[in-house]
Amino acid sequence: MLQRLYVHNYRCLENFELTMKEMSSALLIGKNGAGKSTISSALEVFQSIGRGINRVRQLVQSKDFARGRSDVPIRLEIEVLLEEKLYKYILALELPEKFKELRVFEEQLLVDNNILYSRKEAQVNLYSTFQNREAQFLVDWHLVALPLIQEQSESDPLRTFKTWLAHIIILAPIPSLMTGDSYGETLEPKRDGSNIGEWFSGLLGRYPAAYREVDKYLREIMPDFQDFLNELIGKDFKSLVVRFEENNANLSVNFEDLSDGEKCFFLCAVVLAANKFYGPLFCFWDEPDNYLSISEVGHFITSLRRSFKNSGQILATSHNPEAIRKFSNENTFVLDRKSHLEPTLIRPLSDISIPGDLINALICGDISL
């Protein structure tokens, strides 16, 4: 899964490196503005490329240069271990003088240090067998090449990598936008969770047994939960309805009318089922404890960590003491910025000497790098 993320000259991230080798789960902590959400934005660039978005202006804009420093390229690198092969993807974007839109300066995909394709500006070199040049062609320098290159088979490393990128889950849910209605199916959830209905429909449409996994989790966390229906309301239009039962009395509730926290329970259940049935997946969840009561946070975080322990990988952020306590020092990274004019720093919590209790140190603002 994710081994290394490197970002340079992108917003507050300069020469930034996150290493997650042999970690099934990890936590990012730090003050507001330290750069936690910016990491998710960098990951979202890779996710968008995997989902077929290749116009550079739809991925990165001129305002994304660190402190407006457009004379230095934005560089994004990701290393992923898939099927015991190490994939490394490099993308560098520049903004030449008098240009209004960024263009691709460099792009490269390697598998186990063997080049699949390389690119310098508009020139792309594609290799069929490692180190034997197969073809050269030109690509508009305002387009990322990865989505354009046709994979040759189901087992093609290009297909494997692009599918993994497309299936990256990045979440910062806004429950008020999560209605449970769906006009189609997808396996690609949106950051705000607004297409949970389509995601749920896509999951059950392809993997009917996923219903059991979702049902199991919801019963653990809501004792009066009975079942749920994805009702067909009209042509290609479905709506989620949740049913509860207590003392032989029944109640049906439209998904839209559930509380914010209950919607997040459903979202968590779908994440767990997705990782089991079409994973292993990489999930970045920005503050998963949001909208949850204190008594629910521990179980919620533990369920996520347990699900991803043997398959997949989850990276979370949090300011919540209960969530932070569920991660060890070795699985926790501290982010810090001295000011808005300086870049994000990162260190494992295990490498930092903390006087007394971690939570008290965070409350008092005593942790700095």
Regions found by a protein language model. Give the residues of each.
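C-terminal lobe/lid and adjacent interdomain/linker elements of RecA-like ASCE P-loop ATPase modules
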Residues: 298-369
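N-terminal pre-Walker A segment at the start of P-loop NTPase domains
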Residues: 1-14
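GG-anchored amphipathic helix commonly corresponding to the ABC/SMC/Rad50 NBD signature/C-loop
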Residues: 246-248, 256-285, 295-299, 307
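Conserved glycine(s) of the Walker
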Residues: 35
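The conserved Walker
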Residues: 32
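Electropositive, glycine-dotted interaction segments
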Residues: 87-227
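Conserved P-loop NTP-binding catalytic core
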Residues: 29, 38-102
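Phosphate-binding P-loop
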Residues: 17-23, 275-278
